[in-house]
């Protein structure tokens, strides 16, 4: 079960808690949360409500975007890696693993994934047309711009897709210490 907020916004804690109640089939609930301020606040509120209601719950936070953690402070944003994480956790649950086992598998995967974004134009809000970012009409691209193009990445001259993939793959492999 997924709890979603308005476009480009996190759901509120009550909505997340309501989704947790729907998901609870007697074996416990794993709350997977992206590492964004709004999602974290909603998750924290929902966890408090769930614990108060006596639900068996665990939480795993995803934060794998390597570009947004320049100081190694473990504040990486959660991105597309969460999709694979949902499937991995669900597969473990379908195999009959306990909530603690599913949470441990999800936590291990979450700590060993990396992603990075690349944008060549600014994103725009579909309802009001507002631009996210100030890349504008340039010959630059931004590596590490976030899932909505919020910015915070590194701007570099536009490259071919082959060169861009090579740059991104090298950064991901270095972050994961792959050879």
Language-model segments: residues:
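Solvent-exposed alpha-helices and their adjacent loops that cap or buttress functional pockets
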Residues: 22-25, 50-52, 133-137, 178
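Mixed-charge interfacial surface used for oligomerization/domain docking
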Residues: 68, 93-179
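Alpha-helix capping and helix-loop boundary segments enriched in small/acidic/polar residues
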Residues: 3-14, 34-38, 72-80, 159
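General beta-strand structural signal in soluble alpha/beta enzymes
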Residues: 1-9, 31-33, 58-61, 101-105, ...
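Active-site histidine-anchored catalytic micro-motif
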Residues: 24-26, 38-45, 52-101, 108-115
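Catalytic-loop motifs flanking and including active-site residues across diverse enzymes
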Residues: 12, 81-85, 164
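Glycine-rich oxoanion-binding loops at beta->alpha junctions
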Residues: 1-26, 170-175
